[in-house]
Amino acid sequence: QKRGKTWNAPQNLGTPLNDEEDNAVTCISADGKTLFVLNAYSKTGKTKVGLSKSRRTINGWSYPEKILIDDFQALSHDEIVDGTKIEKTYTEFSITPDEKVIVMGLKRSQTYGERDIYASFRQSNGSYSRPRSLGPVINTADMEGSPFLAADTKTLYFMSKGHLGYGNGDIFVSKRLDDTWTNWSEPLNLGPPINTSEWNGYINVPAASDYGFVSSKRSKNESHDIYRVTMPPQLRPEPLAVVTGRPTNLMTKKTIPAEITLRSVNGDSVNTVSIDLTFDPEEDGEYKFILPIGQDYVFT
């Protein structure tokens, strides 16, 4: 947690999020109450490759629930580590604020190269569709990964070794041009000083901000560190608005249980938030929506 200009020492979140496997948070919901974590957790068997979801409760974080993705594959590939060839399996995920789309970097049987980027869409039963390749504008015969889909759901940042770059993996940005999710603008290299002659990736650009965070290796003899970078206007996502609030009793001013639905004027549901105080009596009741500007919305 950042206080002023400095960060507190990191705290181990403990079980059930951390276990004997490699653990990582891939996304955090806008209200900070939901974590999407790597691995498909299982109380009855061994943790497998995949994605799970955990909610913050009065007793801590809930046991991560596996997110179901049709025909999910994550194949391994050979990698040289300290001169030794080993098999590695990589999975990377980015989720839209409304949780309707998951963008992922992984290797499947039909992958163009070493790793590609795919999109999967939430279905009526709550599971997600078979991953759809983002196509040859994004994916090359080499490696693409560490995708980050900005909150506008149109601006995609990703790492690539196949597009022309400065080093051993650069960060690029591309804009989605339609709803097929296969039609994208030509990827633009973010350039120096964001990209270096070494590996760069795992960018995260907070909503309604002019900066981002990247994992970067600045020189051959350095390790990967996290850096904050200023995003030039041409590299930023489309403008967004962050809307927050809290349902309260008009007389007592206390937070009350509620289900809040946000709809665009054409009737499409943008997002729904439930505030259940019977489940968590310490629930502060605050909700948060991230919205494209220039549109009209209705709260119910």
Where in the sequence are the language-model features?
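Short, conserved micro-motifs composed of acidic
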Residues: Q1-E259, V265-N271, T278-T300
